[in-house]
Amino acid sequence: MDMQNENERLMVFEHARKVAEATYVKNPLDAENLTRWAGALLELSQFQTEPKQMILEAILKLGEALVIDPKKHDALWLIGNAHLSFGFLSSDQTEASDNFEKASQFFQLAVEEQPESELYRKSLTLASKAPELHTGGTAGPSSNSAKTMKQKKTSEFKYDVFGWVILASYVVAWISFANSQTPVSRQ
């Protein structure tokens, strides 16, 4: 993406965050708003040099949403994404593993709530592969060229996974934002 598109995305999600924050003041029990807010925070975290704090804030908002509506599948999926992202950002293997496990649990709950969602099922599959991706994989042929090729494939797969997670988060946040901005018809 070029710089202008990045700046536009930043402005869109910052606006969504501010709208959600203002809505929260009026109605702190709106699970949909909390989910939108968390989605915006996750998107904004991509623009941060230290994204972990913003991801943690998103996890807290999603936790609030799930207290209000424990079966809210998009919040379950989004909190799974937040934990997955946090795990990949963690250099501590134990912390990363804990977050990958939480991600798997939330993705499983999302799948249970909406089993027809291909996105939720793929996210669950990805979460099961996350620990290996995080460590870069341990098994492989002994030759250097084969090892290099495997590392390259693993690295490419990581970027593919991150790309899909980011895209999926963007789509969910955009849909949530669009739904919140629909005009009310007056009849």
Curated annotation (Swiss-Prot):
Q: In this UniProt entry, which residues form the Mitochondrial intermembrane topological domain(s)?
A: 179-187
Swiss-Prot/TrEMBL induction comment: Up-regulated after antimycin A or rotenone treatments.
**Which organs or tissues contain this protein?**
Expressed in roots, flowers, young cotyledons and leaves.
Asked if the keyword Acetylation belongs to this entry, the reply reads yes
Q: What happens when the gene is disrupted?
A: No visible phenotype. Triple mutants tom20-2-tom20-3-tom20-4 are vible but display a slightly delayed flowering time.
Tell me yes or no: is Metal-binding among this UniProt entry's keywords: no
Keywords for this entry? Acetylation, Membrane, Mitochondrion, Mitochondrion outer membrane, Protein transport, TPR repeat, Transmembrane, Transmembrane helix, Transport
Q: What is the protein named?
A: Mitochondrial import receptor subunit TOM20-4
Give the organism the record lists: Arabidopsis thaliana (Mouse-ear cress)
